[in-house]
């Protein structure tokens, strides 16, 4: 089972996708999966593969989803510490239901930008998620789409899903 490992005051903390999902709940598994994979993609690039002190990680993102926010919070405490900044108008990146899949992490003077590659987020999902006044049947379909996206993301390596650029 893959895990994200960070430090808190020098002590190792490990979080699996399942841990993050337990913290978040069942509402947005796709968002939790995005955050999990994005952190796996970005963190090794922020300090040459060394473990990061979690409370020193800052995130600027165009992705406002609650699944992602909860996953980032559990690993980095960025919500509690005011180290996450959501700006839906950030540079071009693939659209999400209510923002964009753009993540800019900073750590001790180094910055990495992570964006999703085409093909992992289906247009029918975005359309369904944005649809106002969904029926109960559509809510069931959307919930399945979220689970399917989480599986699609987790079945791939982070490098296959996301581009990363060191600034």
Spans of features found by a protein language model:
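Non-transmembrane, aqueous-exposed alpha-helical and coiled segments at domain scale
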Residues: 1-28, 32-167
């Amino acid at each position: 089972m893959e895990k994200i490992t960070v430090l808190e005051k020098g002590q190792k903390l490990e979080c699996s996708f399942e841990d993050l999902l337990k913290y978040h709940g069942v509402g947005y598994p796709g968002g939790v999966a995005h955050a999990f994979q994005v952190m796996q993609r970005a963190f090794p690039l922020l300090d040459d593969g060394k473990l990061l002190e979690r409370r020193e990680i800052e995130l600027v993102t165009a992705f406002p989803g609650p699944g992602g926010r909860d996953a980032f919070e559990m690993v980095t405490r960025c919500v509690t510490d005011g180290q996450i900044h959501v700006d839906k108008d950030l540079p071009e990146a693939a659209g999400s239901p209510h923002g964009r899949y753009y993540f800019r992490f900073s750590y001790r003077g180094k910055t990495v930008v992570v964006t999703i590659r085409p093909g992992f987020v289906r247009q029918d999902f975005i359309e369904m998620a944005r649809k106002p006044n969904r029926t109960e049947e559509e809510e069931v379909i959307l919930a399945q789409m979220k689970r399917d996206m989480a599986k699609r993301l987790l079945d791939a390596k982070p490098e296959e899903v996301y581009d990363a650029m060191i600034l």
